[in-house]
From Swiss-Prot:
Chain segments carrying region TAD2: 42-63
Entry-linked InterPro entries: Ets_dom, ETS_fam, WH-like_DNA-bd_sf, WH_DNA-bd_sf
Species name: Rattus norvegicus (Rat)
Record keyword Protein biosynthesis present: no
UniProt cross-references to SMART domains, sorted A to Z: ETS
Coiled coil: none
Region (TAD1 (Acidic)): 1-32
Main location: nucleus
Example GO BP: regulation of transcription by RNA polymerase II
Gene Ontology, cellular component aspect: nucleus
Protein's recorded name: Transcription factor Spi-B
GO terms of molecular function: DNA-binding transcription activator activity, RNA polymerase II-specific; DNA-binding transcription factor activity; DNA-binding transcription factor activity, RNA polymerase II-specific; RNA polymerase II cis-regulatory region sequence-specific DNA binding; sequence-specific double-stranded DNA binding
Amino acid sequence: MLALEAAQLDGPHLSCLQYPEGVFYDLDSCKSFSYPDSDGGPDSTWGWTEAPPAPAIAAYEAFDPAATAAFAHTQAVQLCYGHGPSPSTYSPVGTLDPAPSLEASGPGLQVYPSEDFTSQTLGSLAYAPYPSPVLSEEEDILLDSPALEVSDSESDEALLAGSEGRGSEAGARKKLRLYQFLLELLLRGDMRECVWWVEPGAGVFQFSSKHKELLARRWGQQKGNRKRMTYQKLARALRNYAKTGEIRKVKRKLTYQFDSALLPAARRA
């Protein structure tokens, strides 16, 4: 019976003999399992009493923060937005309304309201009134009054009367009057295609219907008018001479007569 139990327990596993006094194990079959030591080598069964070899200590190296930072895990960074205009949202009507900012301003930061400086600047410039040019007194009078269309005799007489009291300069600036201009043309025989004598002894003369405008322009140049002189303006001045008596209208087309006092003694009838 004991031999059978011994045969069953014999093998690659541990074999033991049972005796009434106790259990005895076979030392050859009951070898302890080997575990790897700190160096990675198998632990020897018979080296239990020996002191394990001291592990090799690496030389001390200086701590390098840059090398450690290369292997450090990146952390999630929270993005901060400025206090500028917040993103816009569309209102139900279709207009673009700015969304209210949910961020509170930090300590020491001032939030200024956004203003449209471009529209304010352009708006004020676009509608700014331009200063009107300053006109002199002489230009003001010329703009308000018709240019040399009033009675030539009356206006010239007024100028002469006012200039006589100013001294010797008045005589040098004495203007040629219209009746004097026409009388000199007729006496010299200039511009015969424009004006001629009808009755020289009576002082009757006549204008040409074709070249009357040419004579009027010549008179405008003589006076130094800025605007173009026309025969209509010249005829208006001739009619005004009827008040002073230098020239009067004759019942004929484009025909006038000088006062006999203006004619030279040789031409008087």
